[in-house]
Amino acid sequence: MKLGVNIDHVATLRNARGTSYPDPLKAAEIAIDAGADFITVHLREDRRHIRDEDVFNLKKSISTELNLEIAATEEMLEIAKKVKPYSISIVPEKREELTTEGGLDIVNMHSKLSSIIEEMHSSSIKVSLFIDPNIDQLKYLEKLGTKPDIIEIHTGDYCDNPSEKKLQLITNAAEYVNKLGIECHAGHGITYEHAKKMTRIPHISALNIGHYLISEAVFYGLHSVVKTMKMTMSN
């Protein structure tokens, strides 16, 4: 199972004082050296953490794949076409939220998402959609004219208040996505304990983890916590 390390909150710390440090690129390099399989950043419309120049620097400099999380807006899609990351992940976005609060509403967005996927594929960019583990939403993937390359299952509800029932919803969602022939990732709120459970779910091929790793890095160092997470996932 692959580990994608989200380094947004390195930029949050930098922006808190308006300094040039800590540098997200340095964090990415450390994470990669410790075993991260790819790097994820979320370029939000309000630029509250990652900025445009961070994304371009990362694409130019890192040795692994870059996954760029963005909202489904014309501005962000144009930036993606200029950056040309390995993949983009379309996420819902509200200015007032502290973090992404849920998955995309595919029921009401399937035609828009189809055109976005087609547009990105024409620029050789893979597309991931961030979706709740809700089969009623996932069924609408079959209505998409062009299929996404990846579905990332939103694990926040489970991670905030774990239960076997919620874990089963994630398991069922991953199985459904796999039957459609789409790669399945998972992310949001994942800790070491959650990761142990996620690695037992068939069909999930990668986890995206950010806030927890950066928080633990304050006490134990980024290299150490990324390495520990990789070991946790491989066990």
Swiss-Prot record:
A GO term, aspect molecular function: pyridoxine 5'-phosphate synthase activity
Transition state stabilizer (site feature) positions: 152
Catalytically driven reaction(s): 3-amino-2-oxopropyl phosphate + 1-deoxy-D-xylulose 5-phosphate = pyridoxine 5'-phosphate + phosphate + 2 H2O + H(+)
InterPro entries: Aldolase_TIM, PyrdxlP_synth_PdxJ, Pyridoxine-5'_phos_synth
Chief location of this protein within or outside the cell: cytoplasm
Gene3D superfamilies on file: Aldolase class I
Top EC class for this record: transferase
UniProt-listed CDD domains: PNPsynthase (cd00003)
EC id: 2.6.99.2
Domain of life the protein comes from: Bacteria
Pathway: Cofactor biosynthesis; pyridoxine 5'-phosphate biosynthesis; pyridoxine 5'-phosphate from D-erythrose 4-phosphate: step 5/5
Gene Ontology CC terms: cytosol
Keywords associated with the record: Cytoplasm, Pyridoxine biosynthesis, Transferase
Annotated catalytic residues: 42 (proton acceptor), 69 (proton acceptor), 188 (proton donor)
Positions with a binding annotation for 3-amino-2-oxopropyl phosphate: 6, 17, 189, 210-211
Protein localization: Cytoplasm
Single Gene Ontology BP annotation: pyridoxine biosynthetic process
Alphabetized HAMAP family for the sequence: PdxJ (MF_00279)
PANTHER family: PYRIDOXINE 5'-PHOSPHATE SYNTHASE
Subunit structure comment from the entry: Homooctamer; tetramer of dimers.
General function of this protein: Catalyzes the complicated ring closure reaction between the two acyclic compounds 1-deoxy-D-xylulose-5-phosphate (DXP) and 3-amino-2-oxopropyl phosphate (1-amino-acetone-3-phosphate or AAP) to form pyridoxine 5'-phosphate (PNP) and inorganic phosphate.
Protein's name in the database: Pyridoxine 5'-phosphate synthase
Source species of the chain: Wolbachia sp. subsp. Drosophila simulans (strain wRi)
Gene: pdxJ
